[in-house]
Amino acid sequence: MRRIVILLILQIIATGFCFGQLPHTFTQYTSEDGLSQNTIMSILQDDKGVMWFATWDGLYKFDGYTFNNYKAHPGDSIGLSNNRLDNIKEDRYGYIWVQSYNHQVYRFNPRLERFQAIPYDNYLSLDMYVLPCGDVWIITVQNELIHISTHPETHEMKATDFFKSHQISYSEPIKSIFQDSRENQWILTENGLYRLTRNGNEEKLSSYFVAPPEKDKQPFYDALENNHTIYFTSKQGCVYEYNPDTGQFVRQEFPTGSSIKTIRQLKKDKLFIGTASDGFFVYEQSSGNHRHYNTRNYPSLKDNQIKAVYIDTNGEAWIRLNTKGVTHFNPENEQFDHFILQDKYGKDIVDSRPEMYIYEDVNGSLWVHPSGGGLAWYDRKNNRIRPFYNPALQSGWSADNKVTNVFTDKQGNFCLLYTSDAADDKA
């Protein structure tokens, strides 16, 4: 049985649709079109509209017609040491930042078509944040935090160990990095918050809730800014509200002993506040009132572990729980719907991939990859998810068809990458 990987680019037509399917045209790309690698790990569209793919055989560029491949060859000077790439992001200057399988980070110059290693030695990257201000942060396996700034005119990179450069004698695990509307950069750690403020060439670092190593630590997990307030989530039901004008924090306590891992904006002045093990809260900012949604209060909720959440343009929540599938929550009528796709044999798809992907395109279509597998679009009128696939290649989804990546571009095209057993495909 031959395994093949297929990249489908779908053009969705923004008109009325027939029941059960969206009007669309498929364009299929395989190795015959120049996309020779069968594992694509990350997709982005740059500010010029060009598509980029991080693969296990280097970096691919797609201009809408042809694929170009950039990778290391023996004896060349391209600047890349490992062709297996895991993650790509674009910065404000148009460079493509690349994270490789051997935990190194490179900056790719699309104009010169060259990779450049960051000016930092002896590190192993774990995660990478590329902020709108142009700065890049790299969290390392060794629990270092590398801060990379780019000169706005020469584009020269400067990399420093954040903790050492600010005389911080001990480092803590990094939970997230966040940039606010004033271009302050916040580092959320297992032990407090740090805020980096830049004024020209001058930098100022402020710390909040940082305790000595032997004291009880205050971790921070997620951040959200709105209405002149920045919200930081923490442990034991705490959310800290920061006022940028006064520099003051106010602590909000929710009735739960669970850590609050997620905060998102709903419609109007409501917030979705998700916990690690006790469901979620809907918090009304103007009144300070909240409502607690967990399996005790709402038995239709499958479990209490909020793994991830996406808020769509209608202000409705799509939640990944520990239970496979996807949970849809409408805050207006407080209705829960749990969806799980079935394969072409009528069985629930639960063993394909654990991730939940939710994407909305410019035409207003909402695409759902439930935890467990498969791909569907949301039929909002009938409140159903409808399986979506190419009938020329498949008779339906199965556990062997693994969606490895999805992406919607600025033109409304939907990129779908999945593996398939050739023996099961239609001609």
Locate each region found by the language model:
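Carboxylate-rich, polar loop motifs that coordinate divalent cations or form catalytic acidic clusters
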Residues: 1-421
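A short, hydrophobic C-terminal helix/tail in secreted or cell-surface proteins
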Residues: 421-427
